[in-house]
């Protein structure tokens, strides 16, 4: 007993040493091949293809003689296919160094070898598979070590020697192609699991493929098939039968993609059967069926009998004890169904075919699915039909990675002969078949692609309404505006009360055509979803061709919401309110309006909504403000006419003016600020500092007009550069504490400036924003305004102080406490307000990424002022 154990130990050491030696030599070859350029690689593989082509007949003969399976002539064709078709397909593939470069996108792809390949080959296609795997391995600069099927060791090794010698003669390293000289399951397992092997390329039975995937390393293992072929009633019968005979008799059915059962519509069943019989195909009689089953299937009837694989129909019939005419090409077994109860509906790898009658298309599809579920999932399914719509339905239904149409399955499945699929002798079955690949395996599967991605700045934009009219009495544009027949005016009650709505009516009355007008005047401050829905209903009833939003930000925002829902009733407020990082890539898109023109006429100088793609709407259920943002909400026309702002009360002018200042400053320091927006931001800031106080205390046409222009200019800037956390916080606490939006911004802004100017705990993420610069941006604003300061820090503080003083000068009490917020209210709401502010859309463009705890502190600081 001890001697036996010692002998086993010695044997294990010998096998291990053999595998270690193969792996070591292969890795040395890998190191040498890594230096090869594309030209040298292509020369080597071309010489391999030529050598294999030269020896395709002797190799085929050797395979048949050694295995006792298959057809000499067909194996010769397979060897030609493995050399000629494979070379033709891969010869122009870039597999070395830089294989692709996109200068515009800044992307470079570099190909590297995956490493040493373990190649496992079957007894069914020994020489052709060896040629194929050797060529795709060396095309990608990967040495390959083979574990051949023991019953085809000699012919497989000869095929490997032929291509190896050609490769070496062309400049490849000596050990670019190797193989296990003394095959065994133990040796194959050791090779697959060896640390010197990078990837396993396995073709064979289910057990071998499973072993390949159990190595803990990448594997390209492809398993067995059980291919159904459906001949539908519109099929060309002669062609379909011919295709099946071509496929099923090729190399005696040993290609795993060959058909295993033909499912035929009942309307043409007899005709198909007769066509088979006309071509020396024997239909097994009912009393012979059991004999055939006993001969073809193994003892348990769950798999093919290995001894009949690749043998001719005549040989199998003789083995089964069935008398058939001389020259019989195929045996067909008529079955009542598929599945375990019908063993001959399994994979048979021989010129034996099951044939089942289908009552209709659904029944046929069920039978095909049953075939695939019986050991063929993921492989191949075939349909013969002239109904192109049915081709697609078949493809959608079948869990097979190759759906072949009007094609012999064996030749069609391997690709390139009958179709445009990648030529291959290793056919992936995807997750259906427990494979990692679902396509035909080729050289592309044996390279690592490294991507060099150069930094890029996102393409930016400058989008505004197509038409912006300004100056006093620019309202007259409505007299000449085209395609105005039915107008709906959206406003708040004040616009009707103070006659502004009538002013618009009067201009529309100057038109040559009779304009029908409907007015929705129920917009409240901080418009709600309920208001938007009510206006949308009126809009749907009236069917306007033009919508005019008349009023402050509330009216314009509400009108945008109505416009959105009127144009596209299926729009989701839930979707529209969601945040985004890039407005062009947002998860929920609002469709562009198509039915109506949208005109905004601002009557306050604050929101800039007349030129922006934003609308702030309050959810009626949660009372939370949400800034909707989509360029579909950009108005078609903005009329910035100062005649509408001459009578705005001082307190409103102060609040809206500070909103303008916040828009301008936040858009200037935004991560998305650009050369196209900063000039607008700066000019708006200067106009506010020059004219707001006068506009509040001693208003005249000039000061009110300048503030009106500043509002629109700031809107133009933040429509494209966006805002920051001042608005994020203001959106939430303004609604919660009942403070006007502009006033809330005024109170927060000095604290935001000081916070943003400090070095960030978390830096902002945006490609164009090269580095943190909010402090210097604020300092630039201070310099532009002529504020005093020797250092950046002093200039930042000067700006924050100037904002604070401006707010005070226009009558704003610059603290939340002074606005009536109690300490108790603050304490019970501040945490939730900070979280909601972080969630706000405006947060994403802030010059530094805020922490929720920091937003909380800003609110606390603003409480005390």
Question: Over which residues does each language-model region extend?
Answer:
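ALDH superfamily catalytic-core signature
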Residues: 6, 13, 131, 209-339
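ATP/NTP phosphate-donor binding region
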Residues: 459-546, 816
